[in-house]
């Protein structure tokens, strides 16, 4: 995290053209070494992209920077991973495309730009939730089976999670880190299933899965551009809503034998499976499916 700073110069990395023979190319992304003392006690302003964060920060530190501010445009905010081997603080600044260009231009054209910075704190913005990660899998399934993929989505971007035993901070405490990817989304989904199983120990795996899918949040979900509404090939049935899943009034069951019989390689038809999704690759205009629900709310289905 950044310490508090007072009247420190913010210097744009793009002022360095020493690493290129083309005068129109610069080192704004900080992926090449800067000249000695290029920053000399300044905070470096570096654009995201091309190389990883550690390279940017270490290049700036070697040139005398006391901190790094990485800016990016048109992407959801991210955590700056891989900084364990760096020696100066670094932060991430998310801006719109227009604001990012204007900000860099201002710092470049109005040097020296002095900044004050309070100590790093926590900022929560609910608008950054339910946005599809740009690295996440999209449907339909790779084998074109007539079963919707992905089926369900869970939080998997910028998750505050405990790290493995043995990773400790300077105070001897086990750290928490921000992680992302399948390593986050998958345990959220598995954990949701385990909790539903604890509530309803008599339910089958298929019933538990259907409870999670049938109650998922499927509105106000966005693609990675943070603007375009997401669709079923982005989120499947939606984002896990564990509270509603535990209160579902309907579930769907399916047998092992039926899953085996639905194998297309053996002449089966996956779209006939009693699952909580509907997909028909040959559907033109109008098509139909048959599904069977079981009431678990104490009233007839």
List the predicted regions and their residue ranges.
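Short coil/turn segments at secondary-structure boundaries
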Residues: 118-119, 224-227, 272
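Structured lumen-facing ectodomains of secretory-pathway proteins
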Residues: 1-154, 162-164, 232, 240-246
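Extracytoplasmic/secreted envelope proteins and their assembly/folding machinery
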Residues: 54-57, 100-104, 132, 186-193, ...
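Active-site-adjacent structural elements in folded domains
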Residues: 30-31, 172-180, 273-277
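Secreted peptidase-domain scaffold signal
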Residues: 2, 25-27, 126-127, 131-136, ...
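Hydrolase catalytic cores
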Residues: 53-83, 153-228
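Marks the mature luminal ectodomains of secretory-pathway proteins
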Residues: 88, 126-129, 135, 142-146, ...
